[in-house]
A protein has these predicted regions:
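Bacterial Sec-dependent N-terminal signal peptides
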Residues: 1-29
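Acidic/polar, low-complexity intrinsically disordered N-terminal segments immediately downstream
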Residues: 29-56, 370, 382-384, 388, ...
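Extracellular low-complexity, O-glycosylation-prone Ser/Thr/Pro/Gly-rich "stalks"
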Residues: 29-47, 279-288, 292-293, 299, ...
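Peptidoglycan-targeting cell-wall enzymes and recognition modules
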Residues: 30-261, 289-293, 297-310
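Surface-exposed helix-capping loop/turn segments at secondary-structure junctions
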Residues: 80-82, 264-272, 335-338
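A Trp-anchored, charged/polar loop motif used as the substrate-binding/catalytic surface
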Residues: 128-133, 275-287
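GST-like fold's C-terminal all-alpha helical module
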Residues: 257-274, 278, 293-294
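C-terminal outer-membrane/trafficking sorting elements
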Residues: 376-455
Length: 455
């Protein structure tokens, strides 16, 4: 099959997938988002959105960043759940994506055979995209939404004047979501830009991976990962990155994906806004890395340019703008002056850079237990070790799995053992089982399953 036919087939698959979204069984609605933001508020917050104000310099004539597109993106991406398996100190993450409405799962990131046989304890965690501004803390949901709005507003603003929210003609906030893609680039002049050598997500030399959408998704490896997550096909967006600037719903999904998905060793923006990431002591020389809050979203999104001790003023000025936008949206969502001030007190910060001696640094230590420091009841954490083993397994679980049953099956599907998890540290004797491959499943909402090697 020639390249043109492959290109056409991927476009057809994208179109069919978009239609299929409307035909799938309904998934749980994101009530947190629905309770915090309305279409009327959206229109007041972003009156200069692309395609809604004057003659748009990038040619948009329809409301690309409409509230309807955002709402559809939030609801549809809520159907996705990601399982991440990691072994501390062992290269690779085994990541699976599941569509909850259909039960269909597919690999997002694979590992080598050596990973499976390495006896290092395995940690499993889940990223449920229904959790976007929708966890148990209404206060943190508001903080997360304000942080999300601040960052997408900054990335796309056509404004030029401070103070944020001051109502001037060039108010940065009023011009949020004005630009759809990065200035200076178009489909016709961008071949090869933002392309990095990457064996897993190789760039297509005929296209460019400049910033597109609310979060300004950039670089081939980000387009490839998002495409794999969304469509189980990395090449759809590697070959057709313009889809992110032509489909408003997909554009918002790209922003939510980037926001919710941890990219080792970075935590996700969602995690840091819900205090679900705790840095290891002594891992960082910069004390600012041990502060919590909004500053980390800046470090995750564009820290290499804006948040380093060596960052140029043109970039550190953007740190201040993000902070001001965040505080502005907190006020819109009902925070009073003292609550907004608290975002820079008691170990929290809205600024990833304050001076050459007080700035953030790169993230290190890809550990899921750090990334989920405060575990909510709907987050299942499981460890099984040693694996392989000849005698005993130790099963470590989070508190919410106490009372659940586990089952062990042989490689032809016959159940060979079952019991109740009565402790967060349970020893399981498999000494009498023949050597071979087994599968341990926990009877819980997510039914995590582990491949066990009996030697």
């Amino acid at each position: 099959m020639n390249q043109l036919h492959k290109h056409i087939n991927r476009i057809v698959f994208y179109i069919l997938t978009s239609i299929l979204f409307r035909c799938l069984p309904a998934v749980a609605q994101n009530t947190g988002f629905d309770n915090l933001l309305t279409a009327a508020q959206w229109n007041l917050l972003f009156p200069k959105r692309a395609g809604t104000f004057g003659v748009h310099p990038q040619g948009y004539t329809a409301d690309f960043f409409s509230f309807a597109n955002l709402k559809q993106a939030v609801d549809e991406i809520s159907d996705y759940e990601v399982e991440i398996r990691i072994k501390e100190g062992v290269w690779g993450q085994l990541i699976t994506v599941t569509r909850k409405s259909t039960g269909i799962s597919y690999l997002y990131s694979d590992v080598s055979p050596d990973w499976h046989t390495n006896p290092t304890p395995e940690t499993v965690a889940y990223v449920d995209f229904l959790d976007f501004v929708n966890r148990s803390s209404s206060q943190n949901n508001k903080r997360e939404l304000a942080a999300f709005l601040a960052n997408i507003s900054k990335e796309t603003t056509g404004g030029w004047q401070l103070p944020v929210g001051g109502g001037t003609d060039g108010d940065y906030a009023l011009w949020g979501l004005y630009f759809v893609h990065e200035l200076g680039y178009t489909s016709s002049n961008s071949a090869g830009v933002y392309s990095a050598t990457n064996l897993e997500f190789p760039p297509n030399p005929a296209v460019g991976y400049y910033g597109r959408g609310p979060i300004q998704l950039s670089w081939n490896y980000n387009y490839g990962q998002f495409s794999k997550f969304m469509f189980n096909d990395k090449n759809i967006l590697l070959d057709n990155p313009d889809l992110v600037q032509s489909d408003g719903v997909l554009a918002f999904k790209s922003a939510i994906w980037f926001w919710m998905m941890p990219q080792c060793p970075k935590p996700s923006c969602h995690m840091v806004m819900h205090d679900l990431w705790i840095p290891d002591m002594l891992s960082y020389s910069a004390s600012k890395m041990y502060q919590k809050g909004f500053a980390h979203t800046n470090n995750i999104i564009n820290g290499g340019l804006e948040c380093r001790s060596t960052s140029a003023q043109a970039f550190t000025d953007k740190v201040f703008l993000r902070s001001e936008l965040y505080k502005y949206y907190l006020g819109i969502l009902g925070f009073d002056a003292s609550q907004i001030a608290a975002e820079n007190l008691n170990g929290y910060s809205t600024l990833c850079y304050e001076s050459e001696t007080n700035a953030m640094e790169d993230y290190v230590d890809c550990q899921l237990d750090n990334m989920l420091g405060s575990i909510e009841n709907n987050t299942e954490i499981v460890q099984i070790f040693p694996n392989p083993t000849s005698k005993n397994l130790q099963l470590g679980v989070s508190e919410d799995l106490l009372g659940a049953s586990y089952e062990i099956y042989d490689n032809i599907g016959k159940k060979v053992m079952t019991d109740i998890i009565q402790s967060q540290h349970t020893f399981i004797s498999i000494e009498k089982l023949p050597e071979g491959i087994y599968f341990l499943t926990i009877d819980s909402a997510r039914r995590p399953t582990f491949r066990i090697v009996k030697q």
